[in-house]
Amino acid sequence: MSAGCTQLVWGGRLHWGASHLLSCLLALCALWVLAAAEPTEGGSANVQGVGEAALYQGRGQHRVPSEDNVAVLSDQWEPSSFQPSSAFSGTDLGTMVADSYRGPGNSDRRSNKELPILLWWSENLFPHFPGDAERIDCPLSSCMVTKNKSVKLHKRTKSIIFYGTDFRAYEAPLPRLPHQTWALFHEESPMNNYVLSHLPGIRLFNYTATFSRESDYPLTLQWLPTIGYLHNPALSMAEKNRWRKNGYAPVLYMQSHCDVPSDRDRYVKELMKHLEIDSYGQCMKNREHPNKRLEDTSTATTEDPEFMAFTARYKFHLAMENAICADYMTEKLWRPMHLGAIPIYRGSPSVRDWMPNNHSIIMIDDFASPKELAEFIMTLDSDDEQYLKYLEYKKPGGTTNTFLLSSMEKREWGVNDMTAPNYLNGFECFVCDKENSRIKAEKTYKKSQQGGAAPEPHIADFNHMGCPMPTPGFGSAQEIPESDSWKQMWLQDYWQSFDQGEALTAMIQRNETNQDRFWDYMHETYIKRSMNH
């Protein structure tokens, strides 16, 4: 965490249902860290994730890979068998922290020494102050949480929580212990780590919190604080038209994160041939910002009042995400709607599922060409009545999407909301309750005299995040020269990330303990694919 956040939040213990102010302050600090992280722009019965795969013959501690299955393909992987727990048990966490408050519905009376431990692998994301450990009392159960990696081999360390942007296949903790699950928190862009967009990468995890509605703890609406955020009054048409007459273009583009997987600048460049667009950021800049302080477009994520007032003058905002993936929607979409501008959107293909009504955004991909889109925008720009139909969701009763309304109502976490936990604390409590349920199920299975199947591990699926290969913002990949920076960077990164997931899976399946051998496994993966082709 930043020094500023440390000074702001200097004490107290987080719990479910109390200390709401502290929780919200922590949320603000954590969001600062998350924003800064984006680039400019397992015998006893133990449930595990990938762990020891079924390719091994036998269930003893000394396993020999099957000769037929040394090179494991993605579609041949199966959940692991049960393996003994780690023998390491010397660490005593009983004195690390005192008990904190009880959460509603939590009757857990175990001492700290008896609780399962959750380890935050990304230290900067640890959502507690002060120190490096805390007891959390969640809706159903309690856990110890820590960022101290010295406990990673502890028999009570039941889950490791990773932050997606920081997760590196070549730095993953090996060997993967059979008694531990892995949890993934990733609310940021797919471009930050394409390993997670492939099945070999995402299935390494047992619990997920991502922007996808299909994840275990969805963060899809992270940029929408409340439904009321959408109902903020728009500038009058008279004022918007006045700014148009004063020389403002109908469309605003403000972006300083260039050369991204969505290749948005390539499309904007073509659109500019047919439509007047004011571009103030470093990408496609064609106009100087009247306020020098606001030239840094990082102010966009802080909702700086002057920035918001300035951008509200524009009738249309080009709202183009830096990567294309289902349910990945950011402030680029929600901010124009808050201000009363019409988003011209490209990003999540499923975005309409989340809109306040069925007539509130313009989808770039609904038009055959940039020229066709430009003609439509110019028509709306000159027709106030038709333009205002896109803002009817701001009227009383205008937000009619019951899916959006119910999703917001059921959301367990909040944004700047003192009555709800932030999503970091919410997810760790989700993992805590799941791990306590898993431990209980394993104990029941071991005590059972009737045999039967052991508890199945919960494993993430492709749709918990899986995102498609990047495609050009305009035209086809075949038309783009091989020397093009977008083609060299993002297509290569996407497919190398697939190989990294395959390599790490193979290392885990073979009980590899040496992280330095990762690139040997990468080479093996490459050779295997070459032979298959």
Swiss-Prot record:
The chain crosses the membrane at residues 21-37. Its main location: endoplasmic reticulum. Disulfide bonds join C429-C432. Coiled coil: none annotated. It comes from the Eukaryota. One of its GO terms (cellular component) is endoplasmic reticulum membrane. Pfam families: Glyco_tran_10_N (PF17039), Glyco_transf_10 (PF00852). Residues 1-20 are cytoplasmic. It is a single-pass type II membrane protein. Residues 38-533 are lumenal. Glycans are attached at N148, N206, N358, N511. GO terms for biological process: positive regulation of protein secretion. InterPro entries: Alpha-1_3-FUT_met, Glyco_tran_10_C, Glyco_tran_10_N, Glyco_trans_10, GT10-like_C_sf. Pathway: Protein modification; protein glycosylation. Protein O-fucosyltransferase that specifically catalyzes O-fucosylation of serine or threonine residues in EMI domains of target proteins. Attaches fucose through an O-glycosidic linkage. O-fucosylation of EMI domain-containing proteins may be required for facilitating protein folding and secretion. Belongs to the glycosyltransferase 10 family. This is GDP-fucose protein O-fucosyltransferase 4. It comes from Xenopus tropicalis (Western clawed frog). The gene is fut11.
